[in-house]
Amino acid sequence: MPLTIRQALREDIPHLCHLMKELSGHEISQEEMNNRLEFIEDSPFDSLYVCEENGAILGLLGFRIRENLEEVSKYGEISVIVVDSGARRKGVGRFLMNYAEKLAFEKGCIGTWLVSGFGREEQAHPFYKELGYEITGYRFVKRF
């Protein structure tokens, strides 16, 4: 059966928590994930999608529309992308990235971008480069 993408639902929360733990290495409670889904549902700019095959959730895509004031344009931000460790190297990540690019194009964006942290140079970064993404800068963070 082919891969499909749909909006994330409340009943997906246990799977979403699992995928986010695979991405970050940290547990996220179902309550916290529910809060994040509520935020996304209330936002006109944010969306959360799951990728399925035969009803099994294999991946997660967070997508956000970002206004770029410097260029007076919009970009589609891939705010989260994660594929279940048991489904990697099977086209799920590429399918999700293609979907994000299609969404961005349909919403009048001039491109897509994402942030990928240190420690992902072996797998994620070559994958993004293969898809045509370029490293264009650094992200600076100050935690409170």
Locations of regions flagged by a protein language model:
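Conserved acetyl-CoA pyrophosphate-binding loop and the N-cap/start of the following alpha-helix
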Residues: 87, 91-99
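Acetyl-CoA-dependent GNAT
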Residues: 7-11, 18-73, 79, 143
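Residue-level recognition of the GNAT/N-acetyltransferase active site
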Residues: 9, 66, 84, 88, ...
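Conserved GNAT acetyl-CoA-binding A-motif
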Residues: 104-116
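Short hydrophobic/aromatic beta-strand or adjacent loop that forms the aromatic wall/cage
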Residues: 46, 135-140
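Conserved active-site alpha-helix within GNAT-family acetyltransferase domains
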Residues: 94, 118-137
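Conserved acetyl-CoA binding element of GNAT-fold acetyltransferases
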Residues: 73-85, 138
